[in-house]
Amino acid sequence: MMVKLICAIVDIAGAAFPIDIDTNELVGDFKKVIKAENSRTIACDANDLRLFLAKTDGRWLTEFEVQNGVADISVFEELDVVGAPLNMIGLSEETVSSVAITKELVKAKKTPLHVLVVPSEPVQLQRKLWLVTGTVVNALGSKGIRRHLHLMASLHIGFYDPTRRVDNKNVAFWYEAKNLCFHVLFKSSTCFFYVSPF
């Protein structure tokens, strides 16, 4: 029996997506489909994905709740048996279609979400990440600016953005002519401002 499962990648805003799959398929097959549908967003191999049933206290999470952040995935059941058919682990056609979708639910973004996806790489699971992006004009001629930006990266307080991969590589810094561009994710608790002495 084919079902449409709504999935969301944890901690990537706007990363909810539908997957059409037969409920007789296995968890391992489901991981491959998720990876194939999100090859630019998910950097790790399909077998390194962790999947969780997006249900708590008998109720599906909503897209609105997931967009506001999932604080603790440990309260959700992990779908960690690769050989388990989806219809035996809470993703049967009956359980998935148990909520009638109405205009009100759609407008409030309270439609049910079925599966939480946690990639193992390249971003460690965090509650909230801030994106810091920008350009340093004429960085090749500015003394010390490259050193400060690369030092910030080497302190391991920033993370690569899995949505920004070039030629299958993580990219946080790159040059466009003489301008140094940066695109880094930070834990909100470690963000800081730097005022250049130059």
Swiss-Prot record:
Protein keywords: Secreted, Signal, Virulence
Principal place of residence: secreted
Location(s) in or outside the cell: Secreted; Host cell
Region feature DWL domain, mapped onto this chain: 56-113
Region (LQLFLAK domain): 16-55
Entry GO CC: extracellular region; host cell
Motif (HVLVXXP motif): 114-119
Segments passing through the bilayer: none
InterPro entries attached to this UniProt entry: Crinkler_N
Pfam families noted in UniProt: Crinkler (PF20147)
Cleavable signal peptide: 1-15
Entry's free-text remark on domains: The CRN proteins have modular architectures that include a signal peptide, a conserved N-terminus, and highly diverse C-terminal domains. The conserved CRN N-terminus harbors a distinct LXLFLAK motif, which is followed by the conserved DWL domain. A highly conserved HVLVXXP motif marks the end of the CRN N-terminal domains and forms a junction where diverse C-terminal effector domains are fused. The conserved CRN N-terminus mediates the translocation into the plant host cells.
Family of this protein: Belongs to the Crinkler effector family.
Function description: Secreted effector that elicits necrosis in host plants, a characteristic of plant innate immunity.
Name the record gives this protein: Crinkler effector protein BLC01
Source species of the chain: Bremia lactucae (Lettuce downy mildew)
Lineage: Eukaryota, Sar, Stramenopiles, Oomycota, Peronosporales
